[in-house]
């Protein structure tokens, strides 16, 4: 059922406002279009830094400034407990398994389009809106998630876990725009955030050193760094600090090509490294994935063709997907891929339509798993 039939003046939209330019323009455009707009600032993390400065305070002040400029009510809502339980705990659990998680995917699924969506519905909202570069449309009896028009900013990779019900209640007013156009609108409207820099990185780490941050929550277990033929190359600081294909921070000197992480032995706490960017051990023919979520109807049959991304801003890769027993997928690549990373998302597309995604368990070549080596 298409839920977008009411006139704007009869429709209440709650906008997730972060204090950035994208969500500011989102609220501004909806107000200009005649919607009843409410701005909500989500406080998901106690992000006071070592000097006692809380970046959320500055961000909320920017939300207040923009909300007052465009004439909408605003509130702050605390989702710290939900974020800890659903996102941060998952983040730590994945690192314990030697994987590299993507908390942004989980945050969208569990916080922005669940806890926040539920809160908005209790306020009487018809929709929630965010400043994501994506599009939500109703076609052929389904609510579909489409890529943002700005291919460099498209964020469907991070929205791959959204369900039909979540997409049905979502609005992405800047999804049909280029980033430069969004900035221009903000500047012409003289919004307080018009010249504010985009935030980058994981929200709860911010500008802090990643190793120092993670070590506050997980005890590091240093161990041996070896080649696959058993030559010791040094010591690692803890397997959780390293990801497939990583080059920097290994501390291996000498002549010749750089060294890269090619695998882990979790049981014996060994990090495997080999030399050369194009080392064969970094390339795989496919991957196994689990925790599958389809944004729309799952493609028919137990095998289908589509394209996929294995990291944000990657060019789409043609793949063949086979549905295995036990809720797993076998994703075979048309062309070999480098440094596939367990814990990250594999996201599937049919043209501009995001079909859904899953969590990468491991990569394989000639039927042999590559990452977790005994």
Curated annotation (Swiss-Prot):
Q: Which lineage is the organism of this entry classified under, starting from the top rank?
A: Bacteria, Bacillati, Bacillota, Bacilli, Bacillales
Spell out the molecular function terms from Gene Ontology.
ATP binding; tRNA binding; tRNA-uridine 2-sulfurtransferase activity
Instruction: Name the gene that codes for it.
Output: mnmA
Q: What is this protein called in UniProt?
A: tRNA-specific 2-thiouridylase MnmA
Where, if anywhere, are coiled coils annotated? none
The entry assigns this protein to a family as follows: Belongs to the MnmA/TRMU family.
- For whether the record's keyword set contains tRNA processing, the answer is yes
Q: Gene3D superfamilies this protein is in? A: Adenine nucleotide alpha hydrolases-like domains, HUPs, Translation factors
Q: Where is this site: Interaction with tRNA?
A: 132, 344
User: Under the cellular component aspect of Gene Ontology, which terms does the record hold?
Assistant: cytoplasm
CDD domains, sorted? MnmA_TRMU-like (cd01998)
Is Iron-sulfur set as a keyword in this record? no
Q: Where in the cell is it found?
A: Cytoplasm
